Design a protein with these regions (language model features):
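Alpha-helical transmembrane segments of multi-pass membrane transporters/permeases
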Residues: 1-6, 12-16, 20-21, 60-66, ...
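Membrane-embedded alpha-helical segments of multi-pass transporters/permeases
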Residues: 2, 6, 27-35, 75, ...
Length: 331
């Protein structure tokens, strides 16, 4: 797709043209692959249609709410706020969202793994806690980095609105720890055939949070968007924990792993702040300071976990195995 877009740059000048390129590439690839694999389309029987409808009637709306919940502050601020507020929130979200994005990427393999194990009659309890908790690990190090370097990041992204940007990026980065957890847990519940539960948790979060951003977005801008985002994630987190007890019989959190990740995040924040304090007084440019702080924070975080956390190492191994194995056996 990228090659075609670059090659025909003069022709691909609209969103419609870009969508056509994407659809054309997929069609050109999927059809030959299907033929090569011997896939023969056929009309599904009534049982297959009933099963598909039972799952899709909740799964499709759930995916829509999932995307809307992620972009809710941008949508609402776009209506009640200013373009500057939208821009500040978008930029802060890009910096703070790296850890939650990794959790989101892990959620599909986790869904597949849980669904496959249940269908095969295999247990999933041995890895669920570690996979969910370990999958949120990146959010801890990102938040630790932002605690120590938010002012440097603000000077890079929005030098004219440093307070608004710093506040927004810290709120979003902090609450993404919860988002990482509930994203993975809700997908695991969906893998057990419970997409309606995942749908309801997001709906509760949106009902509680949209009015906050809508009412205060015009006055407080991006910060109101971040507060609304935080309230939404707190509500969804609480609802997911509540439903997890019914679905799994427990909340899939490894307390020891959380403690070690928290310790690693604190070390990352301390090292990041120290590097920023030292490097700011040198000729190193601001992006260089931010990069040096990131290396120090990530190094400290990794060193702590390698030194004190065997459960975290096991959890990381399971996460990697889950991603690369795509449903294969995990330890």
């Amino acid at each position: 797709q990228l090659l075609l877009v670059v090659t025909f740059d003069a022709v691909v000048t609209s969103a419609a043209a870009l969508l056509l390129v994407s659809a054309g590439v997929r069609f050109a690839l999927f059809v030959p692959v299907g033929v090569a694999l011997g896939v023969v389309p056929r009309v599904p029987d009534r049982h297959a249609v009933d099963r598909a409808w039972t799952f899709a009637r909740w799964s499709v709306p759930d995916q829509i709410l999932d995307r809307f919940s992620y972009n809710m502050p941008v949508f609402v601020l776009g209506v009640v706020g200013t373009p500057a507020a939208v821009g500040i929130y978008e930029a802060a979200d890009r910096f703070a969202d790296f850890g939650a994005t990794i959790s989101w990427r892990l959620s599909s393999p986790l869904l597949t793994k849980v669904s496959g194990d249940v269908a095969a009659g295999n247990g999933y309890d041995t890895y669920l806690r570690g996979a969910v908790t370990g999958g949120t690990g990146a959010t801890f190090v990102v938040f630790g980095y932002l605690i120590g370097a938010h002012d440097v990041v603000a000077r890079i992204a929005f030098a004219d609105a440093r307070w608004a940007f710093s506040t927004t990026v810290l709120l979003v980065g902090g609450v993404n720890v919860l988002r990482g957890f509930w994203t993975l847990t809700s997908h695991a519940m969906e893998g057990l055939g419970k997409p309606s539960v995942s749908f309801r948790t997001k709906l509760y979060g949106l009902v509680a949070s949209v009015p906050i951003t809508a009412l205060f977005g015009a006055e407080f801008g991006a910060v109101a968007g971040a507060v609304g985002y935080g309230v939404m994630n707190l509500v969804v987190f609480g609802a997911v924990c509540h439903y997890a007890r019914d679905v799994f019989g427990y909340v899939p959190v490894d307390a020891e792993t959380v403690a070690h990740l928290t310790l690693g995040g604190l070390v990352a924040a301390s090292l990041t702040a120290s590097v920023v304090a030292v490097a700011t007084g040198t000729p190193l440019p601001t992006p260089g300071v931010a990069a040096a702080a990131a290396v120090a924070g990530l190094g400290g975080f990794s060193a702590v976990l390698l030194a004190v956390s065997p459960p975290t190492r096991v959890a990381a191994h399971r996460v990697v195995a889950m991603v690369w194995g795509r449903g294969g056996r995990t330890p």
